Amino acid sequence: MSQRGNRKTQVGIVVSDKMDKTVVVQVSHLVKHPVYNKYIKRSVKYKAHDEENSCKSGDRVQIVETRPLSKDKRWRVRQIIDRFE
């Protein structure tokens, strides 16, 4: 039996929860500019599967890589770290 490899995880903020069982999570990170040595904030948006529709906009969540669930969804919500108040 082969074991499943380590899956990638990301932490981000839910920016949209308008779809059924799907949330859009924005993951931000800092990148150093090669010439000016200044750190620039870059962000990527991922569509993630939320089975119970428990995530709301503004929540901080951890997402984990999974098999393709649809055309755009390749991530699944593992846990809600902080609720937005």
Swiss-Prot record:
Q: What is an example of a Pfam family matching this protein? A: Ribosomal_S17
GO CC terms for this protein?
cytosolic small ribosomal subunit
GO term, biological process aspect, one: translation
UniProt keywords, alphabetically = Ribonucleoprotein, Ribosomal protein, RNA-binding, rRNA-binding
The UniProt GO MF terms for this protein read:
rRNA binding; structural constituent of ribosome
Look up the domain of life of the source.
Bacteria
Q: How does it assemble?
A: Part of the 30S ribosomal subunit.
- What family is it from? Belongs to the universal ribosomal protein uS17 family.
NCBIfam families in the cross-refs: PRK05610.1, uS17_bact
Cited HAMAP family: Ribosomal_uS17_B (MF_01345_B)
Its function, per the record, reads: One of the primary rRNA binding proteins, it binds specifically to the 5'-end of 16S ribosomal RNA.
Annotated protein name in UniProt: Small ribosomal subunit protein uS17
Tell me what organism the protein belongs to.
Geobacter metallireducens (strain ATCC 53774 / DSM 7210 / GS-15)
Which gene underlies this protein?
Answer: rpsQ
